[in-house]
Amino acid sequence: MSKHSLIENLKEQIEPIAEGLDYELYHIEFVKEGKENYLRIYIDSENGVSLEGCEKVSRAISELLDDIDPIQESYYLEVSSPGIDRVLYTDKHLEKYKSYNIVLNLYSPIDKKKKYEGELVDFNENEIDIKVEENIVTIPREKISKTTLKGEL
């Protein structure tokens, strides 16, 4: 099974578990770091994410993973909040954080810059508009390597 298929399969099964515990499944990733594999589950809620919440979701997901055994190699399960400087992966994430400050990292420079920071004004399937100082800058989505919420306390 490809990594993409694995993630999609896990998403279908983990999403109802997270929702049943009053959390939103924010993102799933399966990564190799050094010699170790990690299945990372990011959860969120309107009221934030507590350590106890992560533990509760982790136990429930762990039971599911033991039952369905979707990953043949050994791995560590990590459940956490996406954090204050969270990556915005989906249109749903972008919609939620319209009018917030974001950081766009680019694959290659546009106007000699590989990083843009500003207020998320709008987006569509092809581009993202951000307000940088008093100007609206339109960045093609294909040029964006990562979109991150600019955490401000």
UniProtKB/Swiss-Prot annotation:
Top-level taxon in the UniProt lineage: Bacteria
HAMAP family: RimP (MF_01077)
GO biological-process terms attached to the record: ribosomal small subunit assembly; translation
Gene Ontology terms: cellular component: cytosol
Gene3D superfamilies: Ribosome maturation factor RimP, C-terminal domain, RimP-like superfamily, N-terminal
Protein name from the UniProt record: Ribosome maturation factor RimP
Family: Belongs to the RimP family.
Keywords from the UniProt entry: Cytoplasm, Ribosome biogenesis
InterPro entries: Ribosome_maturation_RimP, RimP_C, RimP_C_sf, RimP_N, RimP_N_sf
Location of the protein in the cell: Cytoplasm
Function: Required for maturation of 30S ribosomal subunits.
SUPFAM superfamilies, per database record: YhbC-like, C-terminal domain, YhbC-like, N-terminal domain
